[in-house]
Regions:
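N-terminal glycine-rich phosphate/pyrophosphate-binding loop and immediately adjacent elements
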Residues: 2-130
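Rossmann-like flavin
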Residues: 98-194
Length: 195
């Protein structure tokens, strides 16, 4: 008889969360981690006596009925978290070396995101609307984001979209493209190093 029903490789947020869900469903779960500490990108690390705080600094989707709230609620931790909502009009602000005092906001909510950036790019309403609409459409196609019952398959056509090609198709404004890519470093890439 097998000692475990499920083997999970990696103890980042996804691995730990999956293990918890499976254990709550009665499965015997083993989580393997190559590092000395659990947590993946949830942790800090040190090199040459320098501390690198790579852990989670903020996350979205935690308002009631949003995707992470639903996940956290399912495992019984949503109401145990001490959370503080970030600035609705600019949880992130993107700035550039040539205009350091000018900060472009990444606002919460699709419509607010558009409205806040229209203050800086009034000529780009169509592009911003198309960007926000496409974000919503893409997220709705990923099973882990929409929480609806049914096929848990990824849309390969959506996966083939290249972000920079998409941005080039909706605008010629290089500063707007840079602003929209401004938080790309959070995903391990430079501003223009995108697929």
């Amino acid at each position: 008889m097998a000692k475990y029903d499920v083997l999970i490789i990696g103890s980042g947020l996804s691995g730990l969360f999956s293990a918890l869900l499976l254990a709550k469903a009665g499965k015997r779960v083993c989580v393997l981690e190559k590092n000395q500490q659990y947590g993946g990108n949830l942790q800090t690390f040190e090199r040459n006596n320098i501390l690198f705080d790579t852990g989670v600094h903020y996350i979205g989707g935690l308002a009631e009925k949003q995707v992470l709230y639903e996940y956290f609620n399912k495992v019984g931790i949503a109401n145990k978290l001490s959370l503080e909502r970030l600035d609705m009009n600019g949880y992130d602000r993107i700035c550039f070396a040539d205009t350091p005092a000018l900060m472009y906001p990444h606002a919460q909510g699709y419509e607010n995101f558009i409205q806040q950036l229209l203050l800086y790019f009034p000529h780009e309403k169509r592009a911003l609307k198309q960007y926000a609409d496409t974000m919503q459409s893409v997220c709705a196609q990923f099973p882990l984001y929409n929480l609806k019952q049914g096929d848990a398959k990824y849309n390969t056509e959506t996966l083939s979209i290249k972000l920079l090609d998409f941005l080039n198709s909706i605008t010629t404004d290089e500063r707007l493209k840079a602003v929209l890519l401004g938080s790309n470093f959070l995903y391990g890439q430079g501003c223009y190093k995108v697929l």
